Amino acid sequence: MIGRIRGILIEKQAPEVLVDVSGVGYELQMPLTSFYELPELGQEAVIYTHFVVREDAQLLYGFVSKQERSLFRLLIKANGVGPKLGLTILSGMTAGEFVACVERDDIATLVKLPGVGKKTAERLLVEMRDKLKSLMEASVGSEREFMLQSNYKASEVVNTAEEDAIAALLSLGYKPAQASKAVSSVYTDGMSSETLIKSALKSML
């Protein structure tokens, strides 16, 4: 099982990245909360991974922290939550924010995420409450540290920033009209794709 990789980041197209490890390119799908934490292209990245083998594919999911990976593993064990929905949840909120939702029984916030209806949100709150006991203190305690360490540097802005942002939101399950409206409402000149995606997601929660 592949638990961690370290290599040069050679491609970034949210939510997917390509990392060169000794000449071998590893494709990973990452929640946007982790994607934002990645270094610039050409720099070394350390990514914790979760490997999934299916009949038709072998998929590698990446996370910048063990904490986020642990939460992802708990999420996909919940009834009705697969890897895709797990990524969507962790793209819409940090691990600490999800833990806070569970603590507060905050269904209203969860149902704003694509693919999470009222029944799914209620089931998540019930199932995750017990499973999160081992992660609760670490998640909440480190939330401030993660926020302070986050450094969303604007990369070189290209004409496709809006297109990239819309594509990323569509890949998470948002409808075209939702994605386009959210991106248009927050876009300002000079925004990078990553900053635009982050702002658009926040506007929908």
From Swiss-Prot:
<keyword id="KW-0227">DNA damage</keyword>
<feature type="region of interest" description="Flexible linker">
    <location>
        <begin position="144"/>
        <end position="156"/>
    </location>
</feature>
<dbReference type="GO" id="GO:0005737">
    <property type="term" value="C:cytoplasm"/>
</dbReference>
<dbReference type="GO" id="GO:0048476">
    <property type="term" value="C:Holliday junction resolvase complex"/>
</dbReference>
<dbReference type="GO" id="GO:0009378">
    <property type="term" value="F:four-way junction helicase activity"/>
</dbReference>
<dbReference type="InterPro" id="IPR000085">
    <property type="entry name" value="RuvA"/>
</dbReference>
<dbReference type="GO" id="GO:0006310">
    <property type="term" value="P:DNA recombination"/>
</dbReference>
<keyword id="KW-0233">DNA recombination</keyword>
<keyword id="KW-0234">DNA repair</keyword>
<dbReference type="GO" id="GO:0005524">
    <property type="term" value="F:ATP binding"/>
</dbReference>
<dbReference type="InterPro" id="IPR013849">
    <property type="entry name" value="DNA_helicase_Holl-junc_RuvA_I"/>
</dbReference>
<feature type="region of interest" description="Domain III">
    <location>
        <begin position="157"/>
        <end position="205"/>
    </location>
</feature>
<dbReference type="GO" id="GO:0000400">
    <property type="term" value="F:four-way junction DNA binding"/>
</dbReference>
<keyword id="KW-0963">Cytoplasm</keyword>
<dbReference type="GO" id="GO:0009379">
    <property type="term" value="C:Holliday junction helicase complex"/>
</dbReference>
<dbReference type="InterPro" id="IPR036267">
    <property type="entry name" value="RuvA_C_sf"/>
</dbReference>
<dbReference type="GO" id="GO:0006281">
    <property type="term" value="P:DNA repair"/>
</dbReference>
<comment type="similarity">
    <text>Belongs to the RuvA family.</text>
</comment>
<dbReference type="Pfam" id="PF14520">
    <property type="entry name" value="HHH_5"/>
</dbReference>
<dbReference type="InterPro" id="IPR012340">
    <property type="entry name" value="NA-bd_OB-fold"/>
</dbReference>
<comment type="subunit">
    <text>Homotetramer. Forms an RuvA(8)-RuvB(12)-Holliday junction (HJ) complex. HJ DNA is sandwiched between 2 RuvA tetramers; dsDNA enters through RuvA and exits via RuvB. An RuvB hexamer assembles on each DNA strand where it exits the tetramer. Each RuvB hexamer is contacted by two RuvA subunits (via domain III) on 2 adjacent RuvB subunits; this complex drives branch migration. In the full resolvosome a probable DNA-RuvA(4)-RuvB(12)-RuvC(2) complex forms which resolves the HJ.</text>
</comment>
<dbReference type="InterPro" id="IPR011114">
    <property type="entry name" value="RuvA_C"/>
</dbReference>
<dbReference type="InterPro" id="IPR003583">
    <property type="entry name" value="Hlx-hairpin-Hlx_DNA-bd_motif"/>
</dbReference>
<keyword id="KW-0238">DNA-binding</keyword>
<feature type="region of interest" description="Domain II">
    <location>
        <begin position="65"/>
        <end position="143"/>
    </location>
</feature>
<dbReference type="Pfam" id="PF07499">
    <property type="entry name" value="RuvA_C"/>
</dbReference>
<protein>
    <recommendedName>
        <fullName>Holliday junction branch migration complex subunit RuvA</fullName>
    </recommendedName>
</protein>
<comment type="function">
    <text>The RuvA-RuvB-RuvC complex processes Holliday junction (HJ) DNA during genetic recombination and DNA repair, while the RuvA-RuvB complex plays an important role in the rescue of blocked DNA replication forks via replication fork reversal (RFR). RuvA specifically binds to HJ cruciform DNA, conferring on it an open structure. The RuvB hexamer acts as an ATP-dependent pump, pulling dsDNA into and through the RuvAB complex. HJ branch migration allows RuvC to scan DNA until it finds its consensus sequence, where it cleaves and resolves the cruciform DNA.</text>
</comment>
<dbReference type="InterPro" id="IPR010994">
    <property type="entry name" value="RuvA_2-like"/>
</dbReference>
<dbReference type="Pfam" id="PF01330">
    <property type="entry name" value="RuvA_N"/>
</dbReference>
<feature type="region of interest" description="Domain I">
    <location>
        <begin position="1"/>
        <end position="64"/>
    </location>
</feature>
